[in-house]
Amino acid sequence: MLKKKWMVGLLAGCLAAGGFSYNAFATENNENRQASSKTDALTEQEAEAIAKTVVDGTVEDIDRDLYNGKEVYEVEIEKEGEDYDVYVDIHTKQALNDPLKEKAEQVAITKEEAEEIALKQTGGTVTESKLDEDDGAYIYEMEIQTKQGTETEFEISAKDGRIIKQEIDD
């Protein structure tokens, strides 16, 4: 009987020691993994350099963001008067998109053609006009000062010339 109690005590002690050892190893391993992922993480400067290989222009802003469920740096680059967003994966250090290629595939009408479409709807003078990308779709945003003195804002699809929005301001 004394031998059984001694064995149960020894077994309980071994299990407790093993549990403590496993917990210490798991904590240390997790700390090492976190430290290595921090040293492997992409810096803003690296993200900027990678993004500029996709769109060569002036970097205006860099923010951490999510893109298609991945942690990225969103690098906003201005080139020839237009803004482009390049998404660089923080872990793989790869550019995930090519906005110049996307634009070429999606922009079928010129800014002048979009302005003509808007001017047919309301006469006047175009006071502001620019191509903008919104959630992967390219649109022309413009403002027209009418002959009656009101301002009309338009959003026109760059792919097919469809009027997406027309708003009259008093």
Swiss-Prot record:
Pfam families: PepSY. Induction: Up-regulated under secretion stress conditions in a CssR/CssS-dependent manner. The keyword Coiled coil does not apply. Disruption phenotype: Cells lacking this gene show no noteworthy improvement of beta-toxoid secretion. Keywords: Signal. Residues 1-26 form the signal peptide. Overexpression of ykoJ is lethal to B.subtilis. This is Uncharacterized protein YkoJ. It comes from Bacillus subtilis (strain 168). The lineage of its organism: Bacteria, Bacillati, Bacillota, Bacilli, Bacillales.
